[in-house]
């Protein structure tokens, strides 16, 4: 109901006085004393009047004297409560409690009033804010001065004063709105309290408590209202993460237990020197000491270390584990890697390892160590954890955070809409009141004046009301006071607004404005439009509008004409591109001539852009030039370029050159994709403003926490983490480095710095701090950032790229050039034709014909004349181009009409051919993939429509023509008559070949050969040279496959013809592969197989598996989706490359040639600058020492290598070396110094934020958006259904798949029956679940170094649990009999029990006979499977797993595609990188020597992990990095060098394909299905409700008949749980449901389920057809036609019963009347015979007894009545009385019971159905 607003009056704001308090108290007492019969609905506080919000506009501005003083509450909800408000400056509402503060200070106490004035004063808030910021700055000082203690006391005093002010003004804790009732004040109170505790009480761990001071930074959140909103949203999102957190922790616990069982103790396996050398034995014997084996293996000198490694080399005893070098043996010794923190020895450390693995932080290190220690086969464990944990669970957190924040946004939007609606209602009421006032005023004037005066004054009144220019006019005159209307007002002419500006308000109108709730003036609108004073606008117009004289104006017009021409924009765009190209070709080293060329080019381009700016200023005048954002941007860049030219000789000014790169953003004016994406980023940054501040505060706080807690520890215990006892690069000894560590943790790299922290600062404290950083900063905040960024990618934004019809200048210029080209072509062709005809003496065609042809050809290339805006048409000079859309020359695919625009006939024919190759179903002769034309391919659409119109042609069984018409026209002998002779034989041969290649067996055979040939490629590893027999077999097999594919190709040539074969893309792929194979065989026969070119051709065979793409339906769907996404992906890739180009060129300017260093070749250590200062010193030492002047492999020496560096930084792999080199760099050819250039860290921080975070997430956004758009195009049915219908459809879909399972009958045997009752009780399940949890805890307490006693106890506990679960299984088997195996969970339990028993029995045998422990470990995993039974007890977890199950089919398809990509790249890797030097990430396990090792490496790179280490050896080109002549044992291949071009291309392309595309498709599908699962779980009915219905049905339908007795229906629906439950009394509601009742009074399962579902969801007529179809399906699945036929419905049954009740009542009344009449007759007889007596009306009178018998239901009176009546009837009748002819001598028993049963109609009661049935039968 709309609230009523009266006109605003000053008395609306009333002071809060003692009288006000007495009124509130009196009203409260009155309300308590009043007992109202009907409870009033509970009111709620108004949202717009909450504390902290601004006063709604409708109330206007309160008078100045009422600010900052207590006022009566405006909210009606608080009118009856002891509260008051204070409105501060800015009209902010502050609400206070009216009770005494601290039981002393009343609201009228001067001290409290003073505290309130201070508290609400904005200056106080600014002072506190300044104090907080100052305090934060002081806390960041590493070595505070001596007077810092005084400053600290000052801050403490200020905070104490703030708390005192708040407590005095609000009260402490008793009552609403007191100090401690606000959670934000808890922070203030705790900070101040802890400050005093740490100052005055001597505590040991003072540093930990003093860390509370850091939380003062959080006080900044309390000052800004927007930040409070963000924090509330974050807290709400964390609340909603409950189910995901539980599932994540549960999954991690299960994986942790599995990891413990598989890898416990493995990471301690090290290579120990063995056998023991004679020197050691001699030493022991000389000193007569016994040999200490433990000390020997623990001694690090006896362990094998790789160069530069901190931990000993791991190894394993499995066949596929890492091996030790000669002279070493694998033993368990020493501590675990990484200071002992990386291990699987107990639950806690294993959980940390798995948590790190799930977050993918340096997981390649854990992966490599585990596979080396346990074996390559355990890669399967990591695949499961990565795909289920990392890809699924982490992205579920992203989805939950995004949905939670979206809900907060929706709630905020709803609140704003409610306020707007309330405001509109108030405005409407004010308008009506104002009209009434105006009408009254007119009426009073009309009654006082004459007719003429009346008309005149009335007209004036109208004018005064309508035209209030410059005068205050009421808001009632504005119909819609929204921003839209205000903007419309702003669009009025300048003259009116200027007139209105200088008028003065009258005092009377001002008084009226003060008394109105909300008043607007045109002056306010003009002020909002122009914030500066009018004088400034006059001055600007006079100075910056240059129209001084005629010649200048004439010159300006011509300059305007030139500068606004599209060709000028095209020229400037080309200059921008050329300028970027000039800057990007800068490299190191450069010769002087090249450098001079670049300098000259820079000068030329700077001159051009400066001239452009000057000419545009002349053309537009400065007044208009600087009103356009792009012009301002351009002027800044030009000014900086000119400044850079002037400062070019100064040191450090090269960075200014990089700023010229920003000019590339001007391409956004003509590049729609770039424009849209820049807008998205800008909008996201704007929308994320508050979130950015909160994230910055959190980073600041955690950096301070680390600095305060661990700063000193890093200095004291530095020798623990550094060999030279110098601080490492990552430490917390100062605030800046602490900030870098927190930022690195937010980037996902935290585990390495946490190891150092735990080593110097203690495990518990470091774990707590880091976990908070990861959970709050990484998982919540950054996911929220990503979610809001993705929300900017609405379909409207990205689809607008395609739908944008606006024509820019470059398109117009391009169109002009194309039209000129076409005109020249037509002119030349026409001239030549005319000349030829003239020579031949023929008459040339008329001009009209030529003109028509030219017009027709030019029609497609024309634009309407009004393509330009009005201001672009200068002096009537217009353009003749008339095509609304055309091709953009910068990015192909941007325009909607790629294929239509501006192509000649040959281009069109080529385009048609290409489209035909992908689109025509007949032409897909080498593929079963049907090309799906996208919306951007109109040509493909047209051809698709033609195909649909001509289906008969497509179904033709005859082959097509071999050659095109042009070929036959040029070579007529190709046209063969197929009706006779050789032509007929040729035609029959073609038809036979056509039949063969079209046969399914042929296709199956070819696919089999493709798979076989692909599998053969996997065997061609480095060991093939040692297996001569296999090598010969593979060579012959390769030839056989080649011959098979040649035959296939020849058959298809003959069958399909060249035209059709070579217009199919898949056939082209097949042709290339076969051609490469033919060339390989030919070269081997000729002896040229060792040539490099031939070897490269052989690698093309790796593409053979691509041929299988078209044969698998699942991969076909994924490929089609990928093909549809390629245009969007390419656009975003180009934008990312452009963004990165800026950073790359900036890196070249900053670091080119500066990454060189002089190193010791033995240890690879950088020599100190004291020994080597520059390159010359290093060169001098090279001749005498083992030193080298080397460059970092990945550097910024040119833009290309800069791109590679940025890719490593953006994927956080290999970025440390690059960043270290950057911060150590000095000048070119100078030796680096440790962190001499420390603030270069900021370059990488800025790039990570903008270059990595934004641009890489653009891929996710684009792929998800494209995926959703394609789904909308393909899922047509969903587009035509409403949301309610979708809910119905989902619910009905579940119902359709649901079938009433047979209930397991209770056994007849007594013992089995008792056991059945026990195992089916809910208590049994709860008991077993508790045992499973205890079992899980028992498994968690296992550890590697546990004592024998603990080991025996845990073993016995395991035996006990096995016995318990075995007994449970046996009991269930006994009770449920053969039905036990009909339940899936029972089968799972049975399998777990069997495997557990086998593991228990075999464990001794396995250990006794030293069988491989792998089998034993796998069997022990069965114990963990018991834990999975907990899933069925958790509804939320089942919902999330249901989302995963929904995703499985699509994920399987993507997995197939990913496997195919990995397979192909593995073959390429084996061909090119099998023999590279073992360096970096390449070793004896992780390499490309075999197919298995290649797959292990590529799985690692799939998550972008470790690719920098694998890339490093491929960048070696020659000595001394590698040896090109080294022999590889067992092979003929020489050398171990790589190929940088191949290596960079290989790894970059794989990362883009797998990490950025395929993995993101994986993420997109999971997010999509999570949304579906959440939608279904948030529906009124979900899967659990139907399961509950099913289980309840089985309790009533014990025999599983799928029918329920009608009389049991009320009890059944009452037994259901919410929301399906229909509580008693429910018979009337069941009747209204109108369910069918079949024979024998039964109701079917489906009818009840449909009826209950419809009751919950509501009824819609659209779903009737779906109901009928589901009924038909259910009837088909359960054929019982006779029994299923409905007899009646519940509604009809109720009507019949009600009709019977009506008949019974009428009959009862009839019987009653007869009985009373009969009793009266008998009474008369009695009185006549015996005479009148007293007490006739007493209780024992006959009528009274009869009435009592009838109405009190006392059947005992029936026999006395009959005994009294019978003797009376035997007496003779009195002749004077008329006896009725017929009357009942004896009331029948049935009737008596009926009357008794249904008597007392005045008492309302619910008749039971059993009674109704008896009545019906008795009457019948």
Curated annotation (Swiss-Prot):
Region span, Disordered: 483-507, 844-864, 891-959
Pfam families the UniProt entry points to: Ion_trans (PF00520), IQ_SCN5A_C (PF24609), Na_trans_assoc (PF06512)
Residues glycosylated per entry: 278, 288, 317, 591, 1160, 1174
Biased segments, Basic and acidic residues type: 487-507
Subcellular localization, as worded in the UniProt entry: Cell membrane
Record-given protein name: Sodium channel protein
Principal subcellular localization: membrane
Region (Non-homologous region of repeat III): 1172-1194
Region listing for Non-homologous region of repeat IV, in residue ranges: 1490-1505
Record organism: Electrophorus electricus (Electric eel)
GO molecular function: voltage-gated sodium channel activity
Segments in the Extracellular topological domain: 139-149, 198-203, 265-346, 372-378, 579-599, 644-650, 712-734, 756-766, 1026-1037, 1087-1091, 1153-1199, 1222-1243, 1342-1352, 1399-1416, 1475-1490, 1514-1543
Described function: Mediates the voltage-dependent sodium ion permeability of excitable membranes. Assuming opened or closed conformations in response to the voltage difference across the membrane, the protein forms a sodium-selective channel through which Na(+) ions may pass in accordance with their electrochemical gradient.
Entry text on domains: The sequence contains 4 internal repeats, each with 5 hydrophobic segments (S1, S2, S3, S5, S6) and one positively charged segment (S4). Segments S4 are probably the voltage-sensors and are characterized by a series of positively charged amino acids at every third position.
Intramembrane segment spans (from-to): 347-371, 735-755, 1200-1221, 1491-1513
Biological process terms in GO annotation: membrane depolarization during action potential; neuronal action potential
GO cellular component term, pick one: voltage-gated sodium channel complex
Biased composition (Polar residues): 924-935
Renumbered residue ranges of the record's region Non-homologous region of repeat I: 285-342
Domain of life from the UniProt record: Eukaryota
Intervals holding IV repeats: 1304-1602
Stretches forming II repeats: 548-811
Ranges facing Cytoplasmic side: 1-117, 172-176, 225-243, 403-557, 621-625, 672-690, 791-1004, 1059-1065, 1113-1131, 1265-1320, 1377-1380, 1438-1453, 1568-1820
Placement of I repeats on the sequence: 108-410
């Amino acid at each position: 109901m709309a609230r009523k607003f009266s006109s605003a009056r000053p008395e609306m704001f009333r002071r809060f006085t003692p009288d006000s308090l007495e009124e509130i108290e009196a009203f409260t007492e009155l309300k308590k004393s009043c007992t109202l019969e009907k409870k009033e609905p509970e009111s709620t506080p108004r949202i717009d009047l909450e504390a902290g919000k601004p006063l709604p506009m409708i109330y206007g501005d309160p008078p100045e004297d009422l600010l900052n003083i207590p006022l009566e509450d405006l909210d009606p909800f608080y009118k009856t409560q002891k509260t008051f408000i204070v409105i501060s400056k800015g009209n902010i509402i502050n609400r206070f409690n009216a009770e005494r503060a601290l039981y002393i200070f009343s609201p009228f106490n001067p001290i409290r009033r003073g505290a309130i004035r201070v508290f609400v004063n904005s200056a106080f808030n600014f002072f506190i804010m300044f104090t907080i910021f100052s305090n934060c700055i002081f806390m960041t000082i590493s070595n505070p001065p001596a007077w810092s203690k005084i400053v600290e006391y000052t801050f403490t005093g200020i905070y104490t004063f703030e708390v005192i002010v708040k407590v005095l003004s609000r009260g402490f804790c008793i009552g609403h709105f007191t100090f401690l009732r606000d959670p934000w004040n808890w922070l203030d109170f705790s900070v101040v309290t802890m400050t005093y505790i740490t100052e005055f009480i001597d505590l040991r761990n003072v540093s930990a408590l003093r860390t509370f001071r850091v939380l003062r930074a959080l006080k900044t959140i309390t000052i800004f209202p927007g930040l409070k909103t963000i924090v509330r949203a974050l807290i709400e999102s964390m609340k909603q993460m409950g189910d995901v957190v539980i599932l994540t922790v549960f999954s991690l616990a299960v994986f942790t237990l599995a990891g413990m069982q598989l890898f416990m103790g493995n990471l301690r396996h090290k290579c120990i020197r063995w056998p023991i050398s004679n020197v050691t034995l001699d030493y022991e014997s000389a000193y007569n000491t016994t040999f200490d084996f433990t000390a020997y293996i623990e001694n690090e000198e006896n362990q094998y270390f790789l160069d530069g490694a901190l931990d000993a080399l791991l190894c394993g005893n499995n066949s596929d584990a890492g091996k030790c070098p000669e002279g070493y043996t694998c033993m368990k010794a020493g501590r675990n890697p990484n200071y002992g923190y990386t291990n699987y020895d107990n639950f806690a450390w294993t959980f940390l390892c798995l948590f790190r693995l799930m977050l993918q932080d340096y997981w390649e290190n854990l992966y490599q160590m585990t596979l080396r220690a346990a074996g390559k086969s355990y890669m399967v464990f990591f695949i499961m954890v990565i795909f289920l944990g990392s890809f699924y669970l982490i992205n579920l957190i992203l989805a939950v955070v995004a949905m939670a924040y979206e809900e907060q946004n929706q709630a905020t939007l709803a609140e704003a809409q409610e306020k707007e609606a309330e405001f509109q209602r108030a405005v409407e009421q004010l308008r009506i009141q104002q009209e009434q006032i105006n009408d009254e005023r007119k009426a009073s004037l009309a009654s006082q004046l004459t007719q003429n005066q009346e008309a005149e004054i009335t007209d004036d009144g109208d004018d005064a009301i309508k035209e209030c220019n410059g005068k205050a006019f009421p808001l009632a005159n504005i119909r819609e006071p929204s921003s839209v209307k205000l903007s419309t007002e702003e669009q009025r002419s300048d003259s009116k607004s200027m007139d209105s500006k200088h008028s003065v308000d009258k005092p009377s109108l001002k008084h009226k404005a003060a008394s109105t709730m909300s008043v607007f003036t045109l002056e306010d609108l003009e002020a909002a439009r122009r914030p500066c004073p009018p004088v400034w606008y006059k001055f600007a117009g006079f100075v910056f509008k240059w129209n001084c004289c005629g010649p200048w104006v004439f010159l300006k017009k011509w300059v305007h004409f030139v500068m606004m021409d599209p060709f000028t924009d095209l020229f400037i765009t080309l200059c921008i591109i050329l300028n970027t190209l000039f800057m990007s070709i800068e490299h190191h080293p450069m010769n002087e001539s090249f450098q001079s060329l670049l300098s000259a080019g820079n000068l030329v381009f700077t001159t051009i852009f400066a001239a452009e700016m000057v000419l545009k200023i002349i053309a537009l005048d400065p007044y208009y030039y600087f009103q356009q954002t792009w012009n301002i941007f351009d002027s800044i860049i030009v000014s900086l370029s000119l400044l850079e030219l002037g400062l070019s000789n100064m040191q450090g000014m090269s960075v200014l050159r990089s700023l010229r790169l920003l000019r590339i953003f001007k391409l956004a004016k003509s590049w729609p994709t770039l424009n849209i994406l820049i807008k998205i980023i800008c909008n996201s940054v704007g929308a994320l403003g508050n979130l950015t501040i909160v994230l910055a505060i959190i980073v600041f706080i955690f950096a301070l926490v680390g600095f305060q807690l661990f700063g000193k520890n890093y200095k004291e215990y530095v020798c623990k983490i550094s060999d030279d006892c110098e601080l490492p690069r990552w430490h917390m000894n100062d605030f800046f480095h602490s900030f870098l560590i927190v930022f690195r943790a937010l980037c996902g790299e935290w585990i390495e710095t946490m190891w150092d922290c735990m080593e110097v600062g203690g495990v518990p404290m470091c774990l707590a701090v880091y976990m908070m950083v990861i959970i709050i900063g990484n998982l919540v905040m950054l996911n929220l950032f990503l979610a809001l960024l993705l929300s900017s990618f609405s379909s409207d934004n990205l689809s607008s790229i395609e739908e944008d019809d606006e024509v820019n200048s470059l398109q117009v210029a391009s169109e002009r050039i194309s039209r000129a080209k076409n005109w020249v072509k037509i002119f030349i062709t026409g001239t030549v034709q005319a000349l030829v005809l003239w020579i031949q003496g023929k008459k040339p065609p008329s001009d009209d014909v030529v003109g028509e042809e030219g017009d027709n050809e030019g029609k497609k290339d024309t634009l309407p004349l009004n393509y330009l805006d009005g201001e672009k048409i200068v002096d009537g000079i217009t353009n003749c181009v008339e095509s609304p859309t055309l091709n953009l020359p910068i990015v192909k695919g941007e325009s909607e009409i790629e294929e239509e625009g501006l192509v000649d006939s040959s281009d069109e024919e080529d385009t048609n051919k290409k489209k035909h190759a992908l689109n025509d179903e007949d032409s897909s002769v080498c593929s079963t993939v049907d090309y799906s034309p996208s919306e951007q391919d109109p040509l493909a659409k047209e051809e698709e429509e033609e195909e649909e119109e001509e289906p008969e042609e497509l179904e033709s069984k005859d082959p097509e023509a071999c050659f095109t018409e042009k070929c036959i026209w040029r070579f007529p002998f190709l046209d063969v008559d197929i009706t006779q002779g050789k032509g007929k034989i040729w035609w029959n041969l073609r038809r036979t070949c056509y039949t063969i290649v079209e046969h399914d067996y042929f296709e199956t055979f070819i696919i089999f050969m493709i798979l076989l040939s692909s599998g053969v490629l996997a065997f061609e590893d480095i060991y093939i040279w040692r297996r001569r027999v296999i090598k010969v077999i593979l060579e012959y097999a390769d030839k056989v496959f080649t011959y098979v594919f040649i035959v296939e190709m020849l058959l298809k040539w003959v069958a399909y013809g060249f035209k059709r074969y070579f217009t199919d893309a898949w056939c082209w792929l097949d042709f290339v592969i076969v051609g490469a194979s033919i060339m390989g065989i030919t070269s081997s026969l000729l002896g040229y197989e060792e040539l490099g070119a031939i070897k490269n051709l052989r690698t093309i065979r790796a593409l053979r598996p691509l041929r299988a793409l078209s044969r698998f339906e699942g991969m076909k769907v994924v490929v089609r989706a990928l093909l549809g996404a390629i245009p969007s992906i390419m656009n975003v890739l180009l934008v990312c490359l452009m963004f990165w180009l800026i950073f790359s060129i900036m890196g070249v300017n900053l670091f080119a040639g500066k990454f060189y260093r002089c190193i010791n070749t033995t240890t690879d250590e950088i020599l100190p600058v004291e020994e080597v200062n520059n390159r010359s010193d290093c060169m001098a030492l090279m001749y005498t020492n083992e030193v080298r002047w080397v460059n970092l492999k990945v550097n910024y020496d040119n833009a290309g290598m800069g791109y590679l560096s940025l890719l490593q930084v953006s994927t956080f792999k290999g970025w440390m070396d690059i960043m270290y080199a950057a911060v150590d760099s000095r000048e070119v050819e100078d030796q680096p110094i440790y962190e001499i250039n420390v603030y270069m860290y900021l370059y990488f921080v800025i790039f990570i934020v903008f270059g990595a975070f934004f641009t890489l997430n653009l891929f996710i956004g684009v792929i998800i958006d494209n995926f959703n758009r394609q789904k909308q195009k393909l899922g047509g049915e969903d587009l035509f259904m409403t949301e309610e219908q979708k809910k119905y459809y989902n619910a009905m879909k579940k119902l359709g798949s649901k079938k009433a399972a047979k209930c397991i009958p209770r056994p007849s045997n007594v013992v089995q029956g008792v056991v059945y009752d026990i195992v089916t009780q809910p208590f049994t399940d709860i008991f077993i679940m508790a045992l499973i949890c205890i079992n899980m805890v028992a498994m968690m307490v296992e550890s590697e170094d546990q004592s024998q006693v603990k080991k025996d106890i845990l073993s016995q506990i395991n035996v006990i649990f096995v016995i318990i679960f075995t007994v449970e299984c046996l009991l269930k088997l006994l009770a449920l009999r053969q039905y036990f195996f009909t339940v899936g969970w029972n089968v799972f339990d049975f399998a777990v029990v069997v495997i557990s028993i086998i593991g228990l029995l075999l464990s001794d045998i396995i250990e006794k006979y030293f069988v491989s422990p792998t089998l034993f470990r796998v069997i022990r995993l069965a114990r963990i499977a018991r834990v999975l039974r907990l899933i069925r007890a958790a509804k939320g977890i089942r919902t999330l797993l249901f989302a995963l199950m929904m995703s499985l089919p699509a994920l399987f398809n993507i997995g197939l595609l990913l496997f195919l990509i990995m397979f192909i790249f593995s073959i390429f890797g084996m061909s090119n990188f099998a023999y590279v030097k073992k360096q970096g990430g390449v070793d004896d396990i992780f390499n490309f020597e075999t197919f298995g090792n290649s797959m292990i490496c590529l799985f690692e790179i799939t998550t972008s992990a470790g690719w920098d280490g694998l890339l490093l050896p491929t960048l070696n080109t020659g000595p001394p990095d590698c040896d090109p002549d080294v022999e590889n044992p067992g092979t003929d291949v020489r050398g171990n060098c790589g190929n940088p071009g191949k290596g960079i291309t290989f790894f970059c392309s794989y990362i883009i394909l797998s990490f950025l595309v395929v993995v993101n498709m994986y993420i997109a599908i999971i997010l999509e299905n999570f949304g579906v699962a959440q939608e279904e779980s948030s529906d009124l009915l979900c899967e659990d409700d139907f399961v509950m219905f099913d289980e309840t049905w089985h309790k009533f339908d014990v025999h599983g008949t799928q029918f329920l007795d009608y009389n049991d229906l009320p009890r059944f629906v009452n037994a259901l749980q919410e929301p399906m439950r229909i509580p008693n009394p429910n018979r009337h509601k069941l009747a209204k449901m109108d369910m069918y009742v079949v024979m024998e009074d039964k109701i079917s399962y489906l009818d009840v389920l449909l009826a209950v579902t419809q009751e919950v969801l509501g009824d819609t007529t659209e779903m009737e057809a779906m109901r009928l179809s589901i009924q038909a399906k259910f009837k088909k699945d359960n054929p019982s036609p006779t029994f299923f036929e409905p007899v009646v419905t519940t509604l009809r049954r109720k009507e019949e019963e009600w009709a019977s009740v009506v008949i019974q009542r009428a009959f009862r009344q009839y019987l009653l009347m007869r009985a009373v009449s009969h009793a009266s007759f008998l009474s008369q007889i009695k009185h006549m015979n015996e005479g009148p007596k007293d007490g006739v009306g007493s209780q024992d009178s006959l009528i009274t007894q009869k009435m009592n018998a009838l109405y009190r239901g006392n059947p005992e009176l029936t026999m006395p009545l009959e005994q009294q009546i019978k003797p009376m009837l035997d007496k003779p009748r009195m002749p004077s009385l008329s006896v009725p002819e017929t009357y009942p001598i004896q009331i029948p028993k049935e009737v008596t019971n009926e009357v008794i049963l249904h008597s007392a109609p005045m008492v309302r009661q619910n008749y039971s159905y059993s009674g109704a049935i008896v009545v019906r039968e008795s009457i019948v």
